């Protein structure tokens, strides 16, 4: 590990010489083809919502963009039909 000078604020920044191996993320919904995204599948939809009922972002779940849009639409439909709550915890 070596230190390199940062020209932005004249401070030293630690730089790691090793290049890390980044594993490519695989969409968890694309792997299971038998499980379809549906607004009636409450168990699946609850995996992609937070404790407070908010939809989790792609960077946390690892879902591809196409499936994330389908998930969002299914969660909105399930909320509208009162299958899942809008907010689960008291704030």
Curated annotation (Swiss-Prot):
<keyword id="KW-0694">RNA-binding</keyword>
<keyword id="KW-0689">Ribosomal protein</keyword>
<dbReference type="GO" id="GO:0070181">
    <property type="term" value="F:small ribosomal subunit rRNA binding"/>
</dbReference>
<protein>
    <recommendedName>
        <fullName>Small ribosomal subunit protein bS18</fullName>
    </recommendedName>
</protein>
<dbReference type="InterPro" id="IPR001648">
    <property type="entry name" value="Ribosomal_bS18"/>
</dbReference>
<dbReference type="InterPro" id="IPR036870">
    <property type="entry name" value="Ribosomal_bS18_sf"/>
</dbReference>
<keyword id="KW-0699">rRNA-binding</keyword>
<comment type="function">
    <text>Binds as a heterodimer with protein bS6 to the central domain of the 16S rRNA, where it helps stabilize the platform of the 30S subunit.</text>
</comment>
<dbReference type="InterPro" id="IPR018275">
    <property type="entry name" value="Ribosomal_bS18_CS"/>
</dbReference>
<comment type="subunit">
    <text>Part of the 30S ribosomal subunit. Forms a tight heterodimer with protein bS6.</text>
</comment>
<dbReference type="GO" id="GO:0006412">
    <property type="term" value="P:translation"/>
</dbReference>
<keyword id="KW-0687">Ribonucleoprotein</keyword>
<dbReference type="GO" id="GO:0003735">
    <property type="term" value="F:structural constituent of ribosome"/>
</dbReference>
<comment type="similarity">
    <text>Belongs to the bacterial ribosomal protein bS18 family.</text>
</comment>
<dbReference type="Pfam" id="PF01084">
    <property type="entry name" value="Ribosomal_S18"/>
</dbReference>
<dbReference type="GO" id="GO:0022627">
    <property type="term" value="C:cytosolic small ribosomal subunit"/>
</dbReference>
């Amino acid at each position: 590990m070596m230190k390199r000078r940062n020209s932005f604020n004249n401070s030293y920044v630690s730089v790691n010489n090793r290049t890390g191996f980044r594993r490519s993320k695989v969409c968890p919904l694309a792997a299971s083809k038998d499980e379809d995204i549906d607004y009636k599948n409450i168990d699946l939809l609850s995996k992609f919502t937070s404790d407070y009922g908010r939809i989790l972002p792609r960077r946390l779940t690892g879902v591809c963009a196409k499936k994330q849009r389908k998930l969002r639409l299914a969660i909105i439909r399930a909320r509208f039909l009162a299958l899942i709550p809008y907010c689960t915890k008291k704030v």
